[in-house]
Amino acid sequence: MQFTHNISGMRWVARDAPVGSKIYSATSTGIAGPGFALNCDNDGSLALTANMGTPLPVAPGTFPPVDGKDVTGKVLQTSIPGVGLYLELGGFLNGTASNTFQANDGGIGAVPYVGENQRNMAPTPLVMRNLIIKYMALIKTGPIPAGISSFSQEVVRGVVSDVGDAVRLTLGGQVQQAQCTVKADAVSANPVQLGTHDIADFTGQGSTTNPVDFFITLSDCEDDPAGSVARAFMRLDGVDGSVPVDRDLGLFTLTTDSTAAGIGIQVLRSDNTPVKLEEYVDMVGLTPGITRLDLRARYYQTAATVTPGEAKGALNFTIEYR
């Protein structure tokens, strides 16, 4: 009996989502059969089996639970690099009634498994016309190619006692990564001009100048138009001698070629909350096309005395999509 099911729609996953992230899941999926039935009967004296095997390799390594399910050792590698499939069967191939097989993994029915029946099926024998997928999930197993990736392949080959090759299931679907590009002119002003200030503008440690707005543009953003699945995370690291003064405050030193002293530079979000340094910070959900990271920067007095001169700072930024 040949069964075929296509997962509807494009399934999106953030480019830098960790291995083990769920891309898609569904429960209680019924698939119509080819128009004839698989018939089995048992008076309890026979041990009938339904060996639900798979031609797909098992993805190596351990995975975190998905929807509370232990999937390690049962994630099947699809033809899309980095995309695995976890599949539980139900219905006649894995149930609790006397006229069903019961999976030998405690009734979970995670492919591959062997279903067993040694019970009296009377008064109703097993008559299987349709296939039930109790639960399925697409799971990230590694790097996924950019662009649209498709799969359509046989995922289950079932051998049933006295019948032989009895059940085959083909699944198909499409997966695309959510991501953007960072162009050379991504920063609205580079360098960001923080202005010229008098020594009198600094009234003591912790005093600041007025913040200057700037932004970083993420271009060519691709994400689910029905609702973003990815968020942009940004990491800021000092270069050219700029190092953190207070990571949590987003405060860093001037560059080594600066001649001013006693001040640093602070990076803020548009709402004036600090952007932490040297760690990835959740900034914003992706918008298809253009996504903008709105930021501000200002001078921040770090010492009791401020020495006038040129005051420069330098940071590198790195973006991940999770």
Language-model features: locations:
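Mature extracellular/passenger domains of Gram-negative fimbrial/pilin and adhesin proteins
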Residues: 1-322
